[in-house]
């Protein structure tokens, strides 16, 4: 399916979304919701695993919401994504199968199954009266506490554990007011930034920067202050606590310097494939003017600027 569940059908033809199952599995499942047009079930036992099921390198697959397809082979993941796109074009776009065949090209992907993410975000939760950091679970009401993530850049294997340990230690004696924590890492520039998202107000700046520096050796530590209701917060200020105050990444023959709130693709190699595809399609010339109507941090703007007269 488009989400995290496997899809089955009951004897009456009703669709059943099965949590914890992948396509090709034979499972025993418990029905947890019986709606008018569909049902939801939870896997209780895998009777016969799918040929596409793998043993993931992360023990939290199926619990943590960060890698819901982590127990599915890479080949099967790519095939499922292509099929989802084709299905969407036919069902919603009303394209014919022949038109879809013409539109959809083979997926171009990186070679990395794991260890490719340049960013990870953590949410705070309270465990036994103390603040703990973790990731959103498959159940969005729960936070899964972890000290490593195989999806995160493998050149920084201790970064997550070091940052989590430092902030857990600090929370024992300081009210940090953490709303979330972002960690960005680049294997190309060796940059490592820790961004602490908090409300405005007092904050133990020197203690936080010192403890994080000793634990994780980041190149940048910043505090991102936000205002407003939780669901509609806006950034009011980014405060540099230590280091460079920004994160750098080499991409597509250039270097980008990004502030913590700025959006950037979490897969640098994947972003380079996107840039390459856009440049191939546009074929920009030296005397042409390009307009980037939704430029963001400049992922496409900067490569265009190296090829066009003006952007």
Segments from the language model and where they lie:
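Accessory RNA-recognition modules of RNA-modification enzymes
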Residues: 1-311
């Amino acid at each position: 399916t488009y989400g995290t569940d496997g899809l089955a059908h009951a004897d009456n033809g009703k669709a059943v979304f099965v949590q914890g199952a992948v396509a090709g599995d034979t499972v025993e499942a418990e029905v947890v919701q019986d709606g008018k047009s569909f049902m939801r079930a939870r896997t209780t036992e895998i009777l016969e695993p799918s040929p596409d099921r793998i043993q993931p390198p992360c023990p939290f697959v199926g619990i943590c919401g960060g890698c819901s397809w982590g127990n599915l082979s890479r080949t099967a993941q790519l095939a499922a994504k292509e099929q989802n796109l084709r299905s969407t074009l036919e069902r919603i776009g009303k394209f014919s199968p022949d038109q879809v065949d013409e539109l959809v090209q083979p997926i171009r992907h990186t070679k990395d199954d794991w260890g490719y993410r340049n960013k990870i975000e953590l949410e705070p939760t309270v465990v036994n009266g103390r603040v703990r950091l973790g990731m959103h679970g498959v159940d969005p009401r729960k936070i899964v506490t972890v000290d490593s993530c195989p999806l995160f850049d493998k050149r920084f294997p201790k970064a997550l554990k070091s940052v989590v340990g430092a902030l857990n230690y600090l929370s024992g004696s300081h009210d940090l007011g953490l709303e979330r924590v972002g960690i960005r890492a680049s294997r190309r520039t060796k940059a490592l930034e820790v961004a602490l998202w908090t409300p405005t107000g007092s904050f133990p700046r020197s203690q936080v920067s010192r403890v994080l520096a000793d634990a994780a050796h980041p190149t940048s530590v910043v505090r991102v202050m936000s205002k407003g209701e939780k669901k509609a917060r806006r950034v009011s200020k980014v405060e540099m606590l230590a280091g460079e105050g920004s994160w750098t990444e080499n991409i597509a023959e250039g270097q980008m310097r990004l502030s913590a709130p700025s959006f950037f693709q979490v897969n640098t190699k994947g972003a380079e494939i996107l840039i390459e595809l856009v440049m191939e399609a546009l074929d920009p010339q030296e005397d042409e003017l390009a307009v980037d109507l939704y430029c963001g941090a400049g992922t496409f703007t900067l490569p265009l600027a190296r090829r066009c007269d003006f952007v």
